[in-house]
Amino acid sequence: MLQATCARIARRFVWRNRMPRRLFIGLFLLPLPLFAAPPKDELAYAVGARLGMRLQQEMPGLELSELLLGLRQAYRGEALEIPPERIEQLLLQHENATTETPRTTPAEARFLANEKARFGVRELTGGVLVSELRRGQGNGIGAATQVHVRYRGLLADGQVFDQSESAEWFALDSVIEGWRTALRAMPVGARWRVVIPSAQAYGHEGAGDLIPPDAPLVFEIDLLGFR
């Protein structure tokens, strides 16, 4: 699991928030030789230090040797000790175990209940609801990291907030959780209607002027291919 964490972090090293203020008192307790030889690549050291501080706060107790092994293999493009699909599974399990149960507004709860009651709807992980608009003929995407799709996105009131002008490629780790859940279950060639709870989309914050807080989203997605 620790190698999995490193592999994900190496692929997606984006800090969305500033780190908390450092505790300077600890610097005076460090052995003097640590300051004697400055790192040859200060940027690399800075990235490693920031990564270490973040992990110490968010995931204390990681085995450092396994952490560095996963980071090294992912960064160098070497074969990983754990298959990509297992990495995704482990990280999702950790996220679910450490994330508070999201609060659903009454309006969203009513909308999702009505959607769930529609004929042909089935529920996936995280409460994502899918229904088949066109049957697919191909295989599932398996451990693919990119998908080729056409889509249209709507709010609960039917207002279109986004749609593709033409088919587009997306990296799976760049889309919302609800999209990943649905796409992992879709066969190539299928067209699905996907209803995503706000907790699997943009949550309490929303997304700018387009998507309000606590908004469930509806997508019509055509899965054309993967790689």
From Swiss-Prot:
It comes from Pseudomonas aeruginosa (strain ATCC 15692 / DSM 22644 / CIP 104116 / JCM 14847 / LMG 12228 / 1C / PRS 101 / PAO1). Residues 144-227 form the PPIase FKBP-type domain. PPIases accelerate the folding of proteins. It comes from the Bacteria. It is an enzyme of class 5 (isomerase). Pfam families: FKBP_C, FKBP_N. One of its GO terms (molecular function) is peptidyl-prolyl cis-trans isomerase activity. It catalyses: [protein]-peptidylproline (omega=180) = [protein]-peptidylproline (omega=0). This is Probable FKBP-type 25 kDa peptidyl-prolyl cis-trans isomerase. Its EC number is 5.2.1.8. InterPro entries: PPIase_dom_sf, PPIase_FKBP_dom, PPIase_FKBP_N, PPIase_FKBP_N_sf.
